[in-house]
Amino acid sequence: MTPSSNSVKTSRFNKVRTDIIGDTDLPNNLIKSLSKSPPHFYNHIIDKKGLRDIIAWAYKSHGIAATAELADDIKDLGFKYATVAAVSISIDDLKIPKEKKFLLEQAEEQITATEERYRLGEITEVERHTKVIDTWTETNERLVLAIKKNFNENDPLNSVWMMANSGARGNISQVRQLVGMRGLMANPQGEIIDLPIRANFKEGLTVTEYVISSYGARKGLVDTALRTADSGYLTRRLVDVAQDVIVREDDCGTERGIVVEADEKGNYGTKLVGRLAAQSVVVDNENRVLVRRNREIDLITACRIEAADIPSVIVRSPLTCEAARSVCRKCYGWALAHNALVDLGEAVGIIAAQSIGEPGTQLTMRTFHTGGVSTAETGLVRSTLEGSIIFGSKARVRPYRTPHGVEAQQAETDFVLQVKPNNGKKSQKVDITNGSLLFVSDSQEVASDTILAQIISGSSVKKSVEKATKDVICDLAGQVRYDEALQPKEVIDRQGSATHKATRLGRVWVLSGDVYNLPPNAKPVIQGNSKVEEGEVLAESRLSSEHGGVVRLRESTGDSREVQIVTTSMTLKDFKLLGESTHSGEIWHLEAKDTTRYLLKTQPGSKIGNGEVIAELADERFRTKTGGLVKYAPGGLSIKKARSAKNGYEVNKGGTLLWIPQETHEINKDISLLMIEDGQWIEDKTEVVKDIFSQIAGIVTVTQKNDILREITVRPGTLYPCNESKVIERFKGEGLLVDEEEIISKNLKAEKRVFVQSVETSEGPQLLIRPVEEYTIPEVAHLPELAIVKQNSGPYLGLKATQRLNFKDGELIKSVEGVELLKTQLILETFDTTPQMTVDVEKVTDKRSKTLERLQLVILETLLVRRDTISDASHGSTHTELQVNDGDLVKSGDVVATTQILCKEVGIVQLPKQIDNEPIRRIIVERDQDTMTIPLGSAPLVSVGQRLVDGDLLAENDPSPCCGQVETIKNNTIIIRIGRPYMISSDSTLHVKDRELVQRGDSLALLVFERQKTGDIVQGLPRIEELLEARRPRDSAVLCKQPGVLTLRHDEETDSSIAVIKSANGEETEYPILLGRNLMVSVGQHIKAGELLTDGPINPHELLEYLFADLRSRKPLMEAAREAIAKVQSRLVTEVQNVYKSQGVTIHNKHIEVIVRQMTSKVRIEDAGETTLLPGELIELRHVEKVNKAMFMTSSSPAVFIPELLGITKASLNTDSFISAASFQETTRVLTEAAIEGKTDYLRGLKENVIIGRLIPAGTGFSGFEEELRSEAGPHPDILDEDPAGYRRMQNLRPDYTVDMPAAASASPAALLDDPSDDELEATRSRHGIEVTTSNTAAFTRPVIVNKIMEDQILDPDIIASLQEEGLLTRE
């Protein structure tokens, strides 16, 4: 954009000399001239960034109004020229670069080569996938460069290009999709699909590409939706933790600060701008002070510091601020909104929370690059000349396999690599850093332009990696062979199951062959290594009967038919089987010769098991007329203990059952419907309640509750008056059985067995003599005659008759109708059935009389016979023959059917080795197409059993045409068994054993590999959350507990390494290094506490604990805590900043510092000493420091504590304000605890005040009461620090009530009323005869602004005394 002089009103900027703020890409001469006047005309392209800098400069120099005008003018200018030039996007503007075709061809070639390497077993499946993805990513990046070059050189004024380039509309990655290629897509699991979309939107997508494209698009939409919710919740938690951080002081007076370091190039960026120096910055060699302590660092000062090459500056920070429960202005520095020192009362906590939470939605899919290390941080170095490589004496390297499966070496030290030319010219020198990869070896001869190394810059952020697994699927059927190099070992896991793991990188081969799966119980009928023809029988399975019996053939269903063998049968030949139809289905009865009827409990055609009831005899002889009481006669009847009374109680021993009848009506109606009285004698057919009649005569008992009639009991019998109290007492309550001839009372003797009860009637106490019915229970139940037909080895089948009583001794049956006391059951006695062996209930026609039907129980052995099948991929064709006919009698072990597995093609059979007599489940036939015969022109160079890949030499000038194993060598002819190698990385789990047979599609192994987490939502938001919630990561890195020197030891038992660190005092600490973990340090190196020993995410709690423990051993408690916290704080700030930076989001450090300050402000008391604190309590560090100072002054023992790192949620719940905590989460728990502890909420934060509905103590609501309180406190200003009332007044909690006094010579202490009501004020005034209008006497008023008594006022002592008595006045 080239502004013309008439389109921008420059008059206003002519006379002002200015500075520019913000790091800028504008040329230096432009910057210099912008800050001078008058402005000159510059012909520069100004893009989005240039515009930003101009606006920032205008705002800094000329204020808001002028800047708004300038912005408006620039906008008009832009629109004017866009209109004149007719800038718009049309399809012709999308120009595809010619290089695209060439780049795609190159990529295809690379991928074909990779696929070939994979086929030859040189790289693993994971390495292939990584290489493919990296190839496409690189192609995409090269295509972007081609697009840029194409537009810049051929069509710089192209509309699409101008819009994307200037930042007006779209960006380069969108243009890439329009004219380059759409690129790689992710599937819903976030994994990258290795098939890229080669077309762009102008060319149009194929159907496949369209589907894959939709996959990625859908994922984008879903992720955006999820991100919004996650980001919102993160913001809410952040606001909650920091809402009470308000700038309350001007200067806390601290001398501490944090160190801000310059980057590798010596730049600070905006890290220093707006901060205050905690220590003066001095240029060492000149003794020149660049900025004094407690002075602001603006852009110019920052540039001077950079120019003086000062590596680090100590600045003040919210992290080190010592203001109580807030931040002071000097530690916070500039408010970023207006680039000046922050005002008092600014709610910096909420600003910080919003600044961190808001970009959460932007932490999105900016990257799709998973494999390898991203190209930005690594540099490939090529040789510039031809010569030999010299590593030098300092070089230490170890073998390394790159993620693409290239064998290389990794440098363990920094050294210089030289390429020494053969012609004696100057050598090429390359600086190799620790961790760089070398693709050449020492003394190797290299040509010009050979890749020598991949240099990894030291500053590269450690990418977070995760363990992932991938299955290796077999592409062909055959036999598995291990390579020697694999060295598998057995690993037993916690559950005790054994798995095999590869200890080294090596190949698993599958040698081709036709594998047959044998059905269970099939046995091979052919010898190993014998030749078979098509259709020949390979194996045979025999189906035999276990017990023998009579054969029944059923109709076939689906692909199998059923053969049933009747092993045992039992017919109930005494009984006729009778069926009758009812509306609820068919009911079957068994009728005996004496016409007693059993009800059949199992329907004919059903299957039953042992112990089930077949039939039940309902015996009318044991049916009562009414309800009543059951008693077992003593010394006779007994029952078996039953777990449940559902089916009654089995009779153990026969005897007499006694039945005392009574009638019980359950009513549940209003008492007003009762038509008789309690204790009344009634006749039968009497109406007891409306519409309810008694069936028998007897005495009535009425049960009622709350005027609701519950039940009415009628007990039959005879009433006898009785006045003997002993007799009445004896038969009280439930009553007693009285035997025949037993004396009941003086003039009463039992003629037969009766039941006696004493009852209260209107005529006084009487004896009720109740009749007893006797039922005789036989000793054993009658069992009908059975006819049993049984095989010798067959299971037993029988019936058992049992008698069951429905009620136990003393049970009361509440009923009007009669009940059954006893039932006889026929129960099946047999073995426990299995799915193959079941008991069936059948009806059969009687052999003598065709009209009669009998019940028969049979035990059936059911065998399923498979139909013939045609061969498929894993099975040969089968042929099944039945060896029996319907009705045949077979013996135990006889063969019922045979199934033969037939061979599909001509070949040689091989049987696998039998292990521990395990049955053979698969056999393999080696066919002609599984081998290749190769004639040789000269003597062979290979031996039998050797495994080869394509291109290996068999003899001079005879390369192998295939992969496989050499089977035979005869007369210069080689036969190779075709195979397929699969590369398996170390530590992978092997799913197959050596020489095992596998089908196509079986899993051979599970590769374990590390992959970088993708830097999208999976990496962004959850990572921020993980850091701010201070989560303990899974599989965290091993940290060093105390400083010392590292040595390594090998543990034979677990086959793992142990790192041993020996400290200065000779103490040794052991750290087991788990399998798959990489050591981050080398042997002999000195390591500090808290440093990483292995790779992996750091557990921040562990880090704080170890740092504190180490510092505690050398420094005082307070100093150690401060220093340990500072280190963890600095790490947290850096980590959070890294996540945002990786997504291109800029957040000022001070915002993150405010949040981190809240997370690290608390300590946990370990030993309270002589303080009033409690062990385990979480307390602010500042508070403990004060308490310990007091203890020191009184020579008491101080509190001992450990610093604690709290996640934002935990910190919010542990805040001083219970109102704020309760409104966040776990309301009930927080309020309950606050109530139990009797907490006070001083309403210091914003949230508490909003909830109570008061003015918030920030912004204009923040009153600067500090000075007034100081003057009021007089000679003891320190009491304000601890005095809650002081705080309350400072924040204007509520208007206090003051007393206006007449003028006086001397000052008096302040008097405050304890919040009286209007009526109380009025009453007090009138009682003391005070008028509101008077000025010479004290008048009680509610103040408007004044909150203290003026110094020239005095109080009448009598008035004070009476006010104090009434409790209306307190003395402060």
From Swiss-Prot:
Keyword Transcription (UniProt): yes
A Pfam family hit: RNA_pol_Rpb1_5
Chief location category: plastid
Cofactor note: Binds 1 Zn(2+) ion per subunit.
This protein's name: DNA-directed RNA polymerase subunit beta''
Main function: DNA-dependent RNA polymerase catalyzes the transcription of DNA into RNA using the four ribonucleoside triphosphates as substrates.
Entry binding sites for Zn(2+): 252, 321, 328, 331
Family matches, as SUPFAM superfamilies: beta and beta-prime subunits of DNA dependent RNA-polymerase
Gene designation per UniProt: rpoC2
GO cellular component, one term: organellar chromatophore
Names of the cofactor(s): Zn(2+)
Homology family: Belongs to the RNA polymerase beta' chain family. RpoC2 subfamily.
Catalytically driven reaction(s): RNA(n) + a ribonucleoside 5'-triphosphate = RNA(n+1) + diphosphate
Assembly description: In plastids the minimal PEP RNA polymerase catalytic core is composed of four subunits: alpha, beta, beta', and beta''. When a (nuclear-encoded) sigma factor is associated with the core the holoenzyme is formed, which can initiate transcription.
Alphabetical GO biological process terms: DNA-templated transcription
An annotated Gene Ontology molecular function: DNA binding
PANTHER family: DNA-DIRECTED RNA POLYMERASE (PTHR19376), DNA-DIRECTED RNA POLYMERASE SUBUNIT BETA (PTHR19376:SF54)
Highest taxon listed in the record's lineage: Eukaryota
Record-listed E.C. numbers: 2.7.7.6
